[in-house]
């Protein structure tokens, strides 16, 4: 790892707001951004497109090593776009079904190992904000600041419902709550890199906090550690 490029990790369960927080934080700091969940979603989406069984560990490992993917950085008024094999699949990856597939493939040790170096390659100057589920425990264990962001399952389902309402047909709050609870169980119980806070992580419960309040707390921790210079 490049010791000249500091890393801030933001881990947490599905719907905790870590992606939103990480994106805003990276923009404020002028740092690189790693959405590790997108890599797993990309792999699951590509596997389905290529007819690869989501339980076939060796085939998924091979596919992970050769993913033709580009991340087009966010600009003013335009979010980051994700290009897979020449096609913009950003919106496809936010589908709840793709998220469920991603949770399945993320439980496979060979898949996590194949994507590990791809994730670490994002660590470049002036710094990196990395969001995911094992950023602070496995991918960047030496990061000077680790955040574990959570919220109640009910609040996370409510947030996801508001995101999807009007965009996805047939979405319901109860079904989203069931899916979040199922993903929590898969993510925390998997044998390799289970979802858990790093021993030195700062745990933030965002159930009753606004986005700005969470950001203020993180910026305070950055200042205390003098991470961003």
Curated annotation (Swiss-Prot):
Transmembrane residue ranges: none
Keywords: ATP-binding, Cytoplasm, Kinase, Nucleotide-binding, Transferase
Keyword Protein biosynthesis applies: no
Catalysis: reaction(s): CMP + ATP = CDP + ADP; dCMP + ATP = dCDP + ADP
Tagged with keyword Transmembrane: no
GO BP annotations, alphabetical order: nucleobase-containing small molecule interconversion; pyrimidine nucleotide metabolic process
GO molecular function: ATP binding; CMP kinase activity; dCMP kinase activity
Record-listed E.C. numbers: 2.7.4.25
UniProt cross-references to CDD domains, sorted A to Z: CMPK
A Pfam family the protein falls into: Cytidylate_kin
Subcellular localization(s) per the UniProt record: Cytoplasm
GO CC annotations, alphabetized: cytosol
Domain of life (superkingdom): Bacteria
Binding site for ATP: 12-20
Family statement: Belongs to the cytidylate kinase family. Type 1 subfamily.
Entry protein name: Cytidylate kinase
Native source species: Pseudomonas fluorescens (strain SBW25)
Record lineage: Bacteria, Pseudomonadati, Pseudomonadota, Gammaproteobacteria, Pseudomonadales
């Amino acid at each position: 790892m490049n010791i000249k490029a500091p890393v801030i990790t933001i881990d947490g369960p599905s719907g905790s707001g870590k992606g939103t927080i990480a994106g805003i934080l990276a923009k404020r700091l002028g740092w690189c951004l790693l959405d590790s969940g997108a890599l797993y979603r990309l792999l699951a989406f590509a596997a389905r497109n290529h007819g690869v069984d989501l339980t076939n560990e060796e085939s998924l490992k091979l596919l992970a090593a050769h993913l033709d993917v580009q991340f087009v950085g966010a600009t003013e008024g335009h979010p980051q776009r994700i290009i897979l094999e020449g096609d913009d699949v950003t919106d496809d990856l936010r589908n709840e079904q793709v998220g469920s597939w991603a949770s399945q493939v993320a439980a496979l040790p060979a898949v996590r190992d194949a994507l590990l170096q791809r994730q670490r390659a994002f660590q470049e100057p002036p710094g990196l904000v990395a969001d995911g589920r094992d950023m602070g425990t496995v991918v960047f264990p030496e990061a000077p600041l680790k955040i574990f962001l959570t919220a109640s399952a009910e609040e996370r389902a409510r947030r996801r419902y508001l995101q999807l309402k009007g965009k996805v047909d047939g979405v319901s709050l109860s079904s989203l709550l069931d899916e979040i609870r199922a993903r929590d169980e898969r993510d925390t119980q998997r044998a390799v890199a289970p979802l858990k806070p790093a021993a030195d992580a700062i745990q933030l419960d965002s159930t009753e906090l606004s986005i700005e309040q969470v950001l203020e707390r993180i910026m305070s921790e950055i200042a205390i550690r003098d991470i961003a210079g």
